[in-house]
Structures are given as C-alpha cells and as structure tokens.
C-alpha cells in the first residue's frame, strides 16, 4: 500500500513537472521572432553578456529561457533545424538534473545543445559522456557550428590523444568524450606530479548520453590503470595445458557463475603440476606456499570454463579483445586484471602480454557521483527509475514524443526452439517478398553467426561488396564486434527496401536507421513505408526488459510506421537461467499470449532484481573504498599543489616517533631499550642517547619523545641548510607522492582481495558490508602508518649526490 502511494506521488510529481516544462517551452517558443532577425554578431554578444551575468552571480534558472531561445535560433541557422517543444522539455528536465527518457529518434543530440550551452556559461566546463568514440566525435562535429554561432568552444576527448591535446579539449566550454576516458583522465590526473600536468579542470556538470549503458549496465565495471609486473608467459602456458585437459567432473559452477575445482579436480591438477615440476610433493595447492600458483590455476579455470569466445571476447590478428556483454561492441584496450587476460591469451594461443597490477581504479557509479550536477538521456529509463534514484539521486522524466508512436509491438512464445526458428524464417520470407527491411536482433556474436549460418542454409547469401555490386537478392549483412569497422556502412543500408541485417545490441545505438536507406530519395522511402516500415525481429528476449525495448526502438522512429516481433521459446536461456517452471503443452506450437507475457516478465524480473542487488551491493563496498580514495587523493593533491610540505613531513615524523616509543616503551611493562634503539637507528638513521634517566621504566615517555624529536629536527635542519629549502621540499614532495602511489596501488589490490574473500563467506548483505568496512579500515590504518614511517625514513636519508 505504502509503495503504491509512493509511486502515485512520484507519478503526480512527474506530471506536475511536465506541465511546468510545457509552459516554459511555450514561453521559449514565443521568443523566436525576437531572435530570428538578429545579426550573428549580436547573437554572440547576447551570449557573452549572459556569461558575464552568470559570473556576477545570477542563477542559471533566471536566464535559461533566453539561452534556450538563442541556442534554438543558432541551431536553425547552423543546421537548418531547431529543437521542437518535446526537445525543449527534455532539455529543461536535464537542466534540473534528471534522467530524460526520450524515445529513440526523438533527437537527443540536438536536445543536448540547449542544456550544454546554458551550463557552459558558468565557465566551469560541461562534459558530455557518450558510449563510444564514434558518437563523441560525430556529435561534437555535428553540433560545433551551433556552439560557434554562440561564441562557445567545443572539444572532444578520444583514447589516442596526448595530454596536451586533452588539456586543450578540457579547456573548451563543452567537451564531448567517451565516458570511460573521463574516468581514466580523473585517475591519471591524481597520479601527476604537478598541477600543470593535469588535464581536467573540475567536475561541474556532466550529461551522460545513453545513460542506461553507462550508469546502469556498466555502472560497477572498474575503470583501472595498470602497471607492469613482469613476464610469466611460460607459467601461463604450462598451467593452460593442465586446465585444458580437465573434464566436467573436475570442477563445479555455482548459481552465481563462480567456478571451483572439485576434490577430484584438485588431485588431477596437483598430479599434473608435479609432473611439470611446478609443484613438489608433499606440498599441495592448499598450502600457503602455493597461494600464487593456486591463483594462476583458478584464473586459467575461469578462462576455460566461464569465458566463451565470440561471446565474452573475440580473437583477431593474434590478440584477444573483450566484448561488452550488453551492447556486443568490442572494447579495445580493456583487459582483465590479475592474470585473467593472460590466461585467456594462453587459452587461445595468442602472444601473452605482460602481467599487470592495478595502479588506480574507479567505477562509473563512483566517478559520475563526483559531479556537482549530473543528468542523463536515454530511450529506456523508466524500468530503472528506482536504481537511478537510489544510487545517483536522479529522477526519471518521460518526455512525450514529438509525433504519435504508431509502431506495432508483438511477442510470441513457442513451445520449442525448432518452432521458433521456423516462425522467424516465415517472417523473414514474407517481409522480403514485400520489400520490407528487416533487422534481426541476436543476443551475442555467437548467436548472430549461428543465425547467419541458418539463413545461408536456407538459400540466403551474406552481403559483401561483390554481391552488392551484382544486385544479388536474398542477401543479408551481419553487424557484430567482428564487423564493427563497417558499422556505419551497414546501418546506412539497413533501412533500404528488402535489406536484411543481423545484429547484436550494438546496432544503431545513437544512430537512426532511415527508411529507404541513408541517402534515399522520396520514392525509396515511400516504397519502404508502403511495405510497413522497418521490421524488427527479436530472436529471444533479453534478461532485462529494457534491452527488449531498445531493440524494438530501432523501428517506428519519429512517427514512422514499423513493427517489432519477438520470437522466443521455452528452451531459451533467459527462461531456463531464471529457473522459471513451465509446463510444456502437448500439442500447441505456441503458448497463450497471457501466459507467455507472465512467464517472460517473471523471468526478466528475476534477472533485473539480481542485477540491481548486485550493483547496489558493489556500490556499498565501493563507497567505503571511495572514502579512502578521497582521503589519499586529497593528501596527494595538497602535496602536489605546494601546500606546506615541510609542516606535513614534520607532523608525520613526530607521529612516527610516537609510534616507535609507544611500541617499545609501554607504561605497563619494562621498556625494550635495545629494540627501541634499533628501531630509531633503522627508521631515523640516528643514534639518540636513551641512557638513564630514559632507560628507567618509570621515566616519562613524553620526555623521551621530545629528545628524539629534537635530534631529528636538527638533522633535517642541517639537510635543508646544505641543500636549500626549495630543492629539499621539491625532492621530498616527489618522494611523498611516489610513496602514496605505491601504497595506494597495493591497498587497492588488498581491498579487491578482501571483497572477494568476504563474497566467498556468503554472508547476508548487511553483515558483508559491515565486515568489509571493519577490515578495510584496519588495512587503511596500516597503510597510513606505513606512509608515515616511509616518509620519515626517506626524509632522514634524502640528499644530493656529489657531481
């Protein structure tokens, strides 16, 4: 009851906001005559004047209507198109820090210009995060003429850019880039040794395009910077040979997709490792001495059992490239850590890359929550409204479409996989006979290629340049991670009369499939409309209903006709993996639609709840890690930016001395004079007189601390006098930053291991988080103590070599 009331209140609040936005949009439209005849120079001067008013303290809300109207006029002049009321409403929702749910084809790219131009006036920079570099470069180039007319600068961030180019792009008013690159630049900036080397200039406002991909699907994926550990290729190859020979009885997979050796598996692996000289009896894999070897065995087992070629990764040109499991896009440059990627390379017979360790890492969840204001756009958001609100504090506003949606959506659940295949072929043949273009959705690369093989077996040919030039009929194209370089070309032809395209979820994300083809004339477009528009065929339902909606959304854009139909079967993985119990009909070829809808929604709901709980759990862990990361980065930044390094070093040195004395000179026991003397000599490189009265257990430990501190202070003063304060502080600051980087890298790996260990304990969620927080804090205290001691030791030893 309470939940229903809360949802009703939320729905009422959304309706009220939409009413307000519609009224504001009407006022913005009414300003059009005032701006239509303005000379370009006056348009730019108006924006410059508004920028000055913002810097003087005026709120953006007070000028948003005029800025939106000016940007709308700039769009008309630069692109010969201007934002319609639905796009203005979407931009108003974005300005208020919401997720704007705008259906596919409603013009999110143009909508973004309104809110980006407004927030650019703060002078703090606007970041537009896209799912891939193609969209970043396309959108920046496409919208640049609009921003130019307003006197606003536009930059773009791509993976191959050097620091100077990145810095220049970040200095622009509006910066487009891949979401991951913004996160990587944040991590890299926090490892720079001077403020002048950093590239970003703050986190004021971020607009996340395709927000569901970045803020939901990839939210918990760590963005990590790696450093080399060394070459262990022969070890990976040897262990791979052992694991490749295992039988299913040697391992087991639990419901959470974790794999472990059985007792028979341990015996088999140990025997083979002994034969290869990698393990010596009586030592077993359970012994502490075998921890590293066991780690490599487990990673190889994961590579062989859990990761599948053409689903999780592809192999091309002798290298392994990971694939985004949700979009089907290749992720060049992304690598598994902790030896898993090397295990994959050994499995596939590729050249084994150098093993790496994590230098720094952050998740999208944590990174984007750093922005003072965050907003997002996507075609499918309502299903994840709770998650957007719980994790990011963002409400979802569904924006009405500019034109009515006339697409027809259907779903058929077949009793058998064979019946499903026959139905798909019938749909395809009928559409082909009408000249209707067809987009067939596949959940993975492997399934897309299986569909291609099925079509070829039924007389179809895969389209290439030769078949295209000959005008061969009954052809199809395949778009997946293996053919991503031809994505633009394939999408351009996907709406042509009779075109058939098999695609993974990467198809057309951020692009329109135009009826008739990319450069179609009115006659070809009319031909496709007469045939029914684009037909989308889903070959199974996805684990998440949102992914189904994204596929359906390829058809029926901007009021175009279209149809989508999902053909699934009781044998499909999305049903069997959800453990949905279904009674198979004895004779019926399909399941009644009411029953089918219930089954499909129940299966998807189970997957969605599991995924949400997993991401929420990871966020709770990551929030604890983030507190430590913030403390470390704040400390490092204060050293880098020249805050009083000497004062900090003195405080750390005094705390180190206090730690040593507390360890060896406890009030409740006789003092360990020999141990204290050794520790002082080891850490401080000093010989301090601790003879009586300080050798007396009843003596004042504070007086002893004062003597040690005074001796250390004189030693440091002597170094400063001989080296010069500027040189000493510069060397000491760099040493301190290098120490922070080293210790934080090790701490990050310890926290990752701790997360996994606690996960293996299978505790209730609240207990797991509580244990992680307790143990993580103990690890952090130890890291800070190590930092104090190491800084002190280096400071006491630092000097300039004679030339």
From Swiss-Prot:
Stretches of the chain forming a coiled coil according to its record: none
Compartment annotation: Cell inner membrane; Cytoplasm
GO-annotated cellular components: cell envelope Sec protein transport complex; cytosol; plasma membrane
Residue positions binding ATP: 87, 105-109, 512
Disulfide bond entries: none
Single Gene Ontology MF annotation: ATP binding
SUPFAM superfamilies in alphabetical order: Helical scaffold and wing domains of SecA, P-loop containing nucleoside triphosphate hydrolases, Pre-protein crosslinking domain of SecA
Catalyses which reaction(s): ATP + H2O + cellular proteinSide 1 = ADP + phosphate + cellular proteinSide 2
Class in the EC hierarchy, top level: translocase
GO BP annotations, alphabetical order: intracellular protein transmembrane transport; protein import; protein targeting; protein transport by the Sec complex
Keyword Transferase: no
Keywords of the record: ATP-binding, Cell inner membrane, Cell membrane, Cytoplasm, Membrane, Nucleotide-binding, Protein transport, Translocase, Translocation, Transport
Entry similarity comment: Belongs to the SecA family.
HAMAP family membership: SecA (MF_01382)
Subunit structure: Monomer and homodimer. Part of the essential Sec protein translocation apparatus which comprises SecA, SecYEG and auxiliary proteins SecDF-YajC and YidC.
Protein name: Protein translocase subunit SecA 2
UniProt organism field: Nitrobacter hamburgensis (strain DSM 10229 / NCIMB 13809 / X14)
């Amino acid at each position: 009851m309470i939940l229903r009331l809360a949802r009703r209140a939320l729905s009422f609040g959304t309706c009220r906001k939409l009413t307000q936005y519609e009224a504001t949009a009407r006022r913005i439209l009414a300003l059009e005559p005032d701006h239509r005849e303005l000379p370009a120079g006056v348009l730019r001067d108006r924006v410059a004047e508004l920028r000055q008013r913002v810097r003087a303290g005026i709120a953006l809300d007070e000028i948003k209507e005029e800025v939106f109207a000016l940007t709308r006029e700039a769009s008309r002049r630069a692109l010969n198109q201007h934002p319609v009321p639905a796009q203005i409403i979407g931009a108003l929702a974005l300005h208020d820090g919401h997720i704007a749910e705008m259906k596919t084809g409603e013009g999110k790219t143009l909508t973004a210009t309104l809110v980006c131009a407004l927030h650019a006036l703060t002078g703090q920079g606007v970041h537009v995060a896209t799912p891939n570099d193609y969209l970043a470069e396309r959108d920046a180039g496409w919208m640049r003429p609009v921003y130019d007319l307003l006197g606003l600068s536009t930059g773009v961030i791509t993976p191959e850019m050097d620091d100077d180019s990145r810095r220049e792009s970040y200095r622009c008013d509006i910066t487009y880039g891949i979401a991951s690159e913004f996160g990587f630049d944040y991590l890299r900036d926090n490892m720079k040794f001077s403020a002048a080397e950093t590239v970003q200039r703050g986190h004021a406002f971020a607009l996340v395009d395709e927000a569901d991909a970045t803020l939901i699907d990839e939210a918990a994926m760590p963005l990590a910077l790696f450093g080399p550990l060394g070459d262990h290729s022969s070890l990976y190859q040897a262990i791979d040979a052992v694991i490749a020979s295992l039988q299913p009885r040697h391992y087991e997979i639990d419901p959470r997709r974790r794999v472990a050796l059985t007792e028979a598996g341990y015996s088999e692996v140990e025997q083979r490792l002994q034969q290869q000289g990698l393990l010596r009896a009586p030592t077993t894999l359970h012994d502490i001495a075998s921890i590293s070897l066991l780690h490599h065995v487990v990673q190889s087992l994961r590579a062989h059992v859990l990761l599948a070629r053409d689903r999780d990764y592809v192999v091309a040109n002798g290298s392994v490239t990971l694939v985004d499991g949700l979009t089907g896009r290749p992720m060049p440059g992304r690598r598994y850590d902790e030896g898993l990627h090397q295990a994959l390379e050994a499995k596939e017979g590729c050249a084994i890359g150098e093993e790496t360790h994590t230098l720094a890492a952050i998740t999208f969840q944590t990174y984007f929550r750093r922005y003072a204001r965050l907003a997002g756009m996507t075609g499918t958001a309502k299903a994840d409204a709770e998650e957007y609100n719980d994790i990011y504090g963002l409400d979802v506003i569904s924006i009405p479409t500019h034109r009515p949606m006339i697409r027809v959506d259907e779903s058929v659940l077949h009793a058998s996989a064979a019946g499903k295949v026959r139905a798909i072929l019938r749909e395809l043949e009928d559409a082909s006979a009408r000249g209707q273009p067809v987009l067939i959705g596949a959940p993975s690369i492997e399934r897309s290629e299986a569909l291609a093989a099925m079509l070829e077996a039924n007389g179809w040919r895969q389209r290439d340049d030769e078949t295209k030039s000959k005008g061969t009929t009954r052809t199809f194209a395949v778009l997946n991670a293996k053919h991503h370089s031809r994505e633009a070309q394939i999408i351009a032809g996907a709406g042509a009369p009779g075109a058939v395209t098999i695609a993974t979820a990467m198809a057309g994300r951020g692009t329109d499939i135009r009826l008739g083809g990319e450069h179609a004339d009115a006659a070809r477009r009319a031909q496709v409309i007469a045939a029914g528009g684009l037909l989308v065929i889903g070959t199974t339902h996805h684990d998440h209903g949102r992914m189904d909606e994204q596929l359906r959304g390829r058809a029926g854009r901007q009021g175009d006709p279209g149809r989508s139909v999902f053909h699934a079967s009781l044998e499909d993985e999305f049903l069997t993996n959800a453990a949905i119990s279904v009674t198979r009909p004895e004779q019926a070829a399909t399941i009644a639609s009411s029953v089918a809808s219930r089954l499909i929604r129940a299966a998807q709901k189970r997957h969605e709840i599991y995924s949400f709980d997993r991401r929420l759990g990871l966020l709770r862990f990551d929030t604890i890690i983030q507190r430590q990361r913030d403390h470390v980065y704040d400390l490092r930044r204060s050293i880098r930016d020249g805050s009083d390094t000497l004062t900090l070093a003195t405080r750390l040195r005094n705390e180190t001395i206090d730690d040593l004395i507390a360890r060896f000179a406890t009030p409740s026991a006789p003092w360990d004079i020999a141990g204290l003397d050794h520790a002082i000599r080891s850490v401080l490189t000093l010989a301090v007189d601790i003879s009586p009265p300080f050798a007396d257990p009843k003596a004042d430990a504070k007086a002893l601390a004062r003597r040690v501190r005074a001796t250390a202070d004189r030693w440091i003063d002597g170094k400063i006098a001989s080296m010069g304060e500027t040189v000493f502080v510069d060397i000491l600051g760099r040493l301190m930053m290098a120490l922070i980087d080293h210790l934080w890298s090790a701490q990050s790996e310890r926290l990752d291991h701790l997360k996994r260990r606690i996960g293996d304990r299978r505790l209730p969620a609240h207990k797991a988080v509580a244990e992680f927080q307790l143990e993580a804090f103990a690890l952090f205290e130890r890291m800070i103590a190590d930092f104090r001691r190491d800084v002190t030791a280096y400071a006491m030893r630092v000097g300039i070599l004679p030339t």
